[in-house]
Design a protein with these regions (language model features):
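Conserved beta-strand signature within the Rossmann-like core of class I S-adenosyl-L-methionine
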Residues: 132-141, 325-332
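A short glycine-rich, Lys/Arg-flanked "PGG" loop and its adjoining helix->strand segment in the class I
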Residues: 119-131, 312-324
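Low-acidity, Ser/Thr- and Arg-rich intrinsically disordered low-complexity segments
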Residues: 3-9, 17, 22-26, 35-36
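Class I S-adenosyl-L-methionine
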Residues: 157-193, 333-364
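Mobile active-site "lid"/loop adjacent to the S-adenosyl-L-methionine
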Residues: 294-319
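Conserved SAM/SAH cofactor-binding pocket of Class I
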Residues: 35, 41-92, 214-296, 302
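Short beta->alpha hinge that forms the Motif I/post-I loop of the SAM-binding pocket
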Residues: 81, 140, 257-261, 310, ...
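SAM-dependent Rossmann-like transferase core, predominantly class I methyltransferases
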Residues: 26, 163-228
Length: 364
């Protein structure tokens, strides 16, 4: 079943539950560990976080921001804005919540890829941490672990730091007030903002949070005004392509936005006016309906690593979800060999424009 996403305007929030104060895994969680769909290559930052917890037990209940499944962490309330990872957490038996509320004796945090997202997460964690509580942050050395450890230690007392797996997990306490200037600066970063010279709202951590993606802008230039009927925007982000389609193509009866990042989808709801529906959804699992036209700027990275298979999965879903005579409109980096994959799916690709960086393709 596809869950239609509705969000309040706080990009990082979830509600507390009662959990045992012991760090040990309960029998229920042991069963969950056996059936966990955790990938073979576990996130090294997650492994380092679990190691830090074994070496430095903390009080519970706990909240896990940026959660991923791990047997030592199944007792934590999980917040995860990315649908594929949220689905893994749910399959492992973790309690998921859309908006964290209340206070937790411990908060665990696996930051995202950007500095702004990480610092915004610091202030969120502070606001959800009970007096005397512990915040543990874990990230890769190449993602700036040492820099962020230094940054947060200026605001709060550093408890410990554990280095392993080319990552670092470090902890601060809430036994005394944090530095107010640092909190104010981080809180400002966490606020929704407008992309310069536009009316589009974004938040830290979403794709293309500081500007309109040039690939999407190029695709928008090639959307024919004759587009009509039911349209899907897969990997819709904060809604730029859907907004362009509704503005340029008056005969669109409805556009459905499918996006894996709940924060981006919340932005899209603010950015669009018109006949649109919004779905927090993993596109690689398929779509619930067929469409006259599908728009996409498919992702080709999983985390920091290039993953052309992800782009292929998007195109496969699109091909299966087109009505007879329907058309796929996409933009991609010019070096990605998508044409052959489209042909293998029974579509006839046509390159409409190719620049030094991008290519726009129509396939039917």
């Amino acid at each position: 079943m596809i869950r239609r996403f509705r969000s309040r305007w706080i990009p990082l929030i979830v509600g507390a539950r009662n959990f045992p104060t012991s760090l040990r895994i309960s029998p229920k969680n042991t069963k969950a560990a056996k059936r966990s769909p955790q990938s073979k290559a576990m996130n090294p930052a997650l492994e380092t976080l679990a190691l830090a917890l074994r070496e430095h037990p903390v009080a519970w209940p706990a909240l896990f921001l940026g959660a991923e499944p791990h047997p030592d962490l199944f007792g934590a309330t999980a917040w995860q804005p990315l649908k594929p990872l949220a689905d893994l957490c749910a399959a492992a038996g973790m309690a998921l919540s859309d908006e964290p509320q209340g206070k937790f004796r411990s908060v665990f945090f696996l930051p995202g890829k950007t500095k702004e997202e990480t610092l915004a997460g610091f202030v969120l964690a502070h606001d959800l941490l009970a007096l005397g509580g512990t915040l543990i942050i874990s990230l890769a050395n190449t993602s700036g672990a040492a820099r962020f450890e230094k940054e947060i230690s200026r605001a709060a007392p550093l408890l410990f730091s554990v280095s392993k797996n080319k990552c670092r997990a470090f902890a601060v306490s809430n036994t005394e007030p944090w530095d107010t200037a640092a909190l104010a600066a981080w809180r400002d970063l966490a606020q929704p903002r407008l992309i310069p010279d536009t009316a589009f709202t974004v938040v830290p951590g979403v794709f293309s949070a500081g500007h309109i993606d040039p690939g999407s802008a190029l695709l928008a230039q090639h959307l024919p005004p004759s587009l009509r009927g039911e349209v899907a925007d897969i990997g819709a982000g904060w809604g730029f392509l859907s907004n362009a389609a509704l503005a340029q193509c008056p005969n669109i009866s409805r556009i459905d936005l499918f996006e894996a990042d709940s924060r981006a989808l919340a932005c899209a709801r603010k950015n669009l006016i018109g006949p649109a529906e919004f779905y927090w959804h993993d596109v690689t699992t398929g779509l619930p309906a067929k469409y006259d036209h599908i728009l996409t700027n498919p992702p080709f990275h999983t985390g920091q690593a290039r993953d052309i298979g992800l782009g292929h999965a998007f195109l496969t879903t699109a091909a299966k979800s087109l009505k007879r005579g329907g058309t796929l409109h996409l933009v991609a980096n010019r070096q990605l060999p998508y044409e052959a994959h489209l042909v293998s799916l029974g579509l006839r690709p046509r390159v409409l424009e190719e620049t030094g960086v991008f290519k726009v393709i129509s396939a039917s």
